[in-house]
């Protein structure tokens, strides 16, 4: 009757485990030979769990813009360049970064708006024509400004494209390597003062920039203020004409290689151009620039992977930093244990100090206690009649696995334990302890040493028998000269008298010839 509750608990636990395995088997997905591609896609998209990748793919499949479905053709570079020109035209009049407000523009285009209320529209279906080009209007700060595609002329767009072609003939230098970026002269004094006042605001607004502002570029330039251009060439606007807008940094167009002749023929920047102090050129940067000019043929833009769009939607992959390992000693007096993990330290305190030996044996005649439950379960097998461990050689059964291991050594002849004193070998620890105890008792019992060789014996009679057998010449030497002083043997340092307290018996042959040398 006492064992029925334990049987019921084990049956319920086994049933719960079976139900849990059944539920988990329904959630498993077999990828077959596509496991490597699946894991590679999960790492590229930045997911940490396989379920997150599956949910993302399901959402993409059910949405209208699924990448697996046949969608519209990719945008031509001219369309993206047109969007960049619109954004740059806005940056010439306003230092704030425009953001995507949503659809609602003309012909179903997208509307971009900055914090100051300036807007311009652009759509994937809209393509730049000679009659459409961005032209900012110089309005006071209190009014709302908007740039639309209808307020431009074809001649201005042609000038912008020609200026863009001239500027893209020179490669852009890497970040903080070449000469500092330069700006165009402001169209007026009032506009120049406005740009100087908004320098600090531009740095604060960089964190709020959209994807167009921070997209990858071939020169890997910093997303600084919109007015700063990476091209080292300066140009002065003509009278009565708006300064031309250069190509945007986020355009995925290929950039030609940097040539050494373009670096040598470059004119020094004018005095009126403002340069940021943190990007000032140093001698080390000049050396890097010359090295870059020699290997400029390799500085070409790489094609953008196809999965960049999905990566941009879910954000960059988070890189986890390795946690610092700290040494945490146990604060209980007399312990001295040191751990590198807080979890291990708490486990040690709980089971070694706080709940020390909290698992007691239920047998009234035993009374043993243990720190861990698994040790108690192993101990409970000694009180039961269950013998689950069977020897494969003789079919003998045992209660514990350790007893089976020791018994198996009888069949294999293995004796892994050895005495350090005499080299005695045995199969189990108990036999070695019993053997070493004999060594300790024997050393304590040998109280009578031999004065000639130092060997020890348990009884004085054993010492006398040893002297008569091993040292007979040394025993007969002192008997020849009873009247004179005894002369010691050269091989003995200081022999004691024959009639010592060890109970040695005198020699029975006093007439034996002496072996001492004559003087």
Swiss-Prot record:
Zinc finger (C2H2-type): 328-353, 359-383, 389-411, 417-439, 448-471
GO molecular function: DNA-binding transcription factor activity; DNA-binding transcription repressor activity, RNA polymerase II-specific; RNA polymerase II cis-regulatory region sequence-specific DNA binding; zinc ion binding
Gene: ZNF692
Family (UniProt): Belongs to the krueppel C2H2-type zinc-finger protein family.
PANTHER family, per database record: TRANSCRIPTIONAL REPRESSOR CTCFL-RELATED
Keywords assigned: DNA-binding, Metal-binding, Nucleus, Phosphoprotein, Repeat, Transcription, Transcription regulation, Zinc, Zinc-finger
Protein name in the entry: Zinc finger protein 692
Matches recorded under Pfam families: zf-C2H2
Tissue specificity note: Ubiquitous. Highly expressed in brain, thymus and spleen.
Compositional bias (Acidic residues): 188-206
GO CC annotation: nucleolus; nucleoplasm
Main location: nucleus
Skewed-composition ranges (Pro residues): 177-187
Compositional bias segments (type: Low complexity): 247-266
Biological processes, Gene Ontology terms: negative regulation of transcription by RNA polymerase II; regulation of gluconeogenesis; regulation of transcription by RNA polymerase II
Residue ranges of the region described as Disordered: 123-314, 469-519
Record has Cytoplasm as a keyword: no
PTM per Swiss-Prot/TrEMBL: Phosphorylation at Ser-470 results in loss of DNA-binding activity.
Modified residues (Phosphoserine): 162, 231, 470
UniProt function note: May act as an transcriptional repressor for PCK1 gene expression, in turn may participate in the hepatic gluconeogenesis regulation through the activated AMPK signaling pathway.
Biased composition (Polar residues): 145-155, 277-303, 501-519
Highest taxon listed in the record's lineage: Eukaryota
InterPro entries assigned to the protein according to its UniProt record, in alphabetical order: ZnF_C2H2-type_TF, Znf_C2H2_sf, Znf_C2H2_type
Consequence of changing residue 470 to A: Reduces phosphorylation by AMPK. Does not affect DNA binding. Does not repress transcription of PCK1
Biased composition (Basic and acidic residues): 164-173
Subcellular location: Nucleus
